[in-house]
C-alpha cells in the first residue's frame, strides 16, 4: 500500500515553489560577473571554494518538501544549461527567477496562467531570433582568448592556454584537463582518441559531481565478445588487481553475473574498472576495435582468432596514460601503442579512402583516420592546495566548454547587453490578451543580468541601465572589471551566443511550467513532517 501524500493547491502551491526557487537563485546569483562573490561548500574531504553556478545549485537541498520541488526545478535550469553549453548557468538561473517572481505577481492579480505562459514562449522565441542575428563567427585567436578568459572568471592564463590548445589540435579537436604533478599549469599534446560509447552503469563513476569515470595509467581489455560469465573474467581481473592498476573493458557487452560481480567489487573498493560497449556496428566495429588496439598496444580478443578472455596475458592488454568515460563517450589519452604500427594503420586507412566507392564509406574512414592521427591537447593544472586545484579545474572546464560553444554558434556582446538589447525585438509582439503580460515579464527579466552584475560590483543597476539606454551603440555597456562604460565588443567582453540562447530558453521553459502549476504532491512522513494546511490523503 502506498504511503500518505501531502497536497497543496493553487496560490499556496506556487508560493512554495517560489520560495524554493528564490533560495537557490539568491545563493547562485551573487557569483555573476567579474566582481561576483565566491561560495564555500563543505565537503567530507575539504571545502570547495567556487563561483560556478551549477556546482553551487547542486549542493542545495531544502528541508521543506514543497519548497524543495521549486529548488529542484530551478536546479534543472542550471543543469540543462551546463549539459548543453558548460557555462551560463548563473545567468539562466537568474532569468528563471525573475520570470517566476514577476509571473506570480501577475497571476495573483488575476492574469490567466496559460496565456501568460504563451506570452513568455513568444517573447523567448523573439529574443532567440535577435541573439542569432547579432552573433559574430569566431575566426581568430584573440576572440578565443577573450571568451575563455571571461568564462574562467577573467583568468588570462587559462584563456591563453585554451587558445594555444585549440591552435595545436584544431577548433574541434580533443582537449583534456588533468591534475599536474607540480605547481605549474602546462600544455602538452599526446596521442589519443574518442568514441561515442559511455559507461554501462553509473556505478562505475569516480567523480559523482561531473558523473565521469577517470583513471590514470590504465590497462585496456578489448574484445568483440559478450562477457557474461564471472569465471572467464577472474584471471584478467586478478592480474590487474595484483598490480594495483585500473582496467577499461571494451566489449560487445558486459551482462548477467559478470556485470553484477563488477558492480559488487567496485562498491567494495576491490576493483578499479570501467566497462563500455564497443563502438560501431558489424565490420566497422571490428575495424574500429583494431584501431583502438593498435593505438593502445593491445590485441583484440576475438573468437575468429580462437582466443579466450580467460587466457589473456599482460601482453594482450593495452595501456593508456588516462581514460575518461562519461555516459555518452570514452576518451583515451596517451595510448602506448608503437608509433610505427599506428603509422602503418593510418596508411592502410588512407588507401581504403582512395578506393572507397561511396561518400558514406569515405566519411567513416576519414573519421577513423582522424581518430588515429589526431592528438589530444592535455592541459595539466597545477596549484598549491587541493582546494585551489579543484576551483581552478572547474574554471578551466567552464572556459573550455564556453569556448567550444563560441566556435559552434559565434559570439555576442557580453555584460548582459545582448539580452538587454533583445528587449527592442519584443516591441513587435502585439497581443490584446494576457499574452502581453508574458511578454512584459520577459522584458523585465532581460534587464536582470545587467542589474545583478552592477549590484555585485557595488553600484546601482537602475543607474547603469539608464546610462546604457541613452546610447544608440548596441555594444555600449558597463565593463564591471574596469568600472568603465565603453564598447564591450571592442574591449573583449563577449559571450558565446549558444550559452546566452540556451540559458534563456531553459529559463523560459521552467518559468512557464511553474506559473501554470496548480497542485503539488509529495510523500508525507508521519514521524518527520509537521501537519500543516496541506491536504493529506
From Swiss-Prot:
Its EC number is 5.6.1.7. It is an enzyme of class 5 (isomerase). Keywords: ATP-binding, Chaperone, Cytoplasm, Isomerase, Nucleotide-binding. GO terms for cellular component: cytoplasm. It is found in: Cytoplasm. It comes from the Archaea. CDD domains: GroEL. One of its GO terms (molecular function) is ATP-dependent protein folding chaperone. The keyword Transmembrane does not apply. The keyword Isomerase applies. ATP binds at residues 31-34, 87-91, 415, 495. It catalyses: ATP + H2O + a folded polypeptide = ADP + phosphate + an unfolded polypeptide. GO terms for biological process: protein refolding. Forms a cylinder of 14 subunits composed of two heptameric rings stacked back-to-back. Interacts with the co-chaperonin GroES. Together with its co-chaperonin GroES, plays an essential role in assisting protein folding. The GroEL-GroES system forms a nano-cage that allows encapsulation of the non-native substrate proteins and provides a physical environment optimized to promote and accelerate protein folding. Belongs to the chaperonin (HSP60) family. This is Chaperonin GroEL. The lineage of its organism: Archaea, Methanobacteriati, Methanobacteriota, Stenosarchaea group, Methanomicrobia.
Amino acid at each position: 500500500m502506498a504511503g500518505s501524500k501531502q497536497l497543496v493547491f493553487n496560490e499556496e502551491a506556487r508560493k512554495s515553489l517560489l520560495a524554493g526557487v528564490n533560495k537557490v537563485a539568491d545563493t547562485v546569483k551573487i557569483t555573476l560577473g567579474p566582481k561576483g562573490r565566491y561560495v564555500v561548500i563543505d565537503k567530507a574531504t575539504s571545502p570547495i571554494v567556487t563561483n560556478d553556478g551549477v556546482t553551487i545549485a547542486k549542493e542545495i537541498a531544502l528541508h521543506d518538501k514543497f519548497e524543495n520541488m521549486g529548488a529542484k526545478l530551478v536546479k534543472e535550469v542550471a543543469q540543462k544549461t551546463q549539459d548543453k553549453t558548460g557555462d551560463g548557468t548563473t545567468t539562466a538561473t537568474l532569468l528563471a527567477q525573475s520570470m517566476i517572481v514577476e509571473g506570480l505577481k501577475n497571476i495573483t492579480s488575476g492574469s490567466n496562467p496559460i496565456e501568460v505562459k504563451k506570452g513568455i514562449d513568444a517573447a523567448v522565441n523573439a529574443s532567440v531570433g535577435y541573439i542569432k542575428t547579432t552573433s559574430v563567427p569566431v575566426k581568430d585567436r584573440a576572440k578565443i582568448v577573450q571568451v575563455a578568459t571571461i568564462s574562467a572568471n577573467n583568468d588570462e592564463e587559462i584563456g591563453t592556454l585554451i587558445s594555444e590548445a585549440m591552435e595545436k589540435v584544431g577548433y574541434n579537436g580533443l582537449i583534456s584537463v588533468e591534475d599536474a604533478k607540480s605547481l605549474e599549469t602546462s600544455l602538452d599534446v599526446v596521442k589519443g582518441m574518442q568514441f561515442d560509447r559511455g559507461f554501462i552503469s553509473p556505478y562505475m563513476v569516480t567523480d559523482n559531481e561531473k558523473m565521469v569515470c577517470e583513471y590514470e595509467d590504465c590497462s585496456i581489455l578489448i574484445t568483440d565478445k559478450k562477457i557474461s560469465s564471472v569465471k572467464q573474467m577472474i584471471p584478467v581481473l586478478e592480474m590487474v588487481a595484483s598490480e594495483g592498476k585500473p582496467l577499461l573493458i571494451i566489449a560487445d557487452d558486459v551482462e548477467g553475473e559478470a556485470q553484477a560481480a563488477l558492480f559488487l567489487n567496485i562498491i567494495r573498493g576491490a576493483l578499479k574498472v570501467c566497462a563500455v560497449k564497443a563502438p560501431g556496428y558489424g565490420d566497422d566495429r571490428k575495424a574500429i576495435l583494431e584501431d583502438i588496439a593498435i593505438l593502445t598496444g593491445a590485441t583484440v580478443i576475438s573468437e575468429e582468432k580462437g582466443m579466450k578472455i580467460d587466457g589473456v596475458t599482460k601482453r594482450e592488454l593495452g595501456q593508456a596514460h588516462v581514460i575518461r568515460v562519461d555516459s555518452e563517450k570514452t576518451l583515451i589519452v596517451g595510448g602506448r601503442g608503437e608509433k610505427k604500427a599506428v603509422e602503418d594503420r593510418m596508411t592502410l586507412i588512407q588507401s581504403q579512402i582512395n578506393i572507397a566507392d561511396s561518400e558514406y564509406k569515405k566519411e567513416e574512414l576519414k573519421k577513423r583516420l582522424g581518430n588515429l592521427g589526431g592528438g589530444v591537447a592535455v592541459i595539466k593544472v597545477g596549484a598549491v592546495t587541493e582546494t585551489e586545484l579543484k576551483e581552478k579545474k572547474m574554471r578551466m572546464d567552464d572556459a573550455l566548454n564556453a569556448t567550444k560553444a563560441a566556435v559552434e554558434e559565434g559570439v555576442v556582446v557580453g555584460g548582459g547587453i545582448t539580452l538587454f538589447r533583445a528587449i527592442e525585438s519584443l516591441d513587435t509582439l502585439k497581443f490584446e490578451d494576457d499574452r502581453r503580460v508574458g511578454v512584459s515579464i520577459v522584458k523585465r527579466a532581460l534587464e536582470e543580468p545587467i542589474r545583478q552584475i552592477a549590484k555585485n560590483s557595488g553600484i546601482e543597476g537602475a543607474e547603469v541601465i539608464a546610462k546604457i539606454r541613452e546610447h544608440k551603440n548596441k555594444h555600449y555597456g558597463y565593463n564591471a572589471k574596469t568600472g568603465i562604460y565603453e564598447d564591450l565588443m571592442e574591449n573583449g567582453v563577449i559571450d558565446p551566443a549558444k550559452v546566452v540562447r540556451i540559458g534563456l530558453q531553459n529559463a523560459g521553459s521552467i518559468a512557464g511550467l511553474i506559473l501554470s502549476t496548480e497542485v503539488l504532491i509529495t510523500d508525507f512522513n508521519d514521524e518527520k513532517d509537521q501537519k500543516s494546511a496541506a491536504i493529506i490523503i
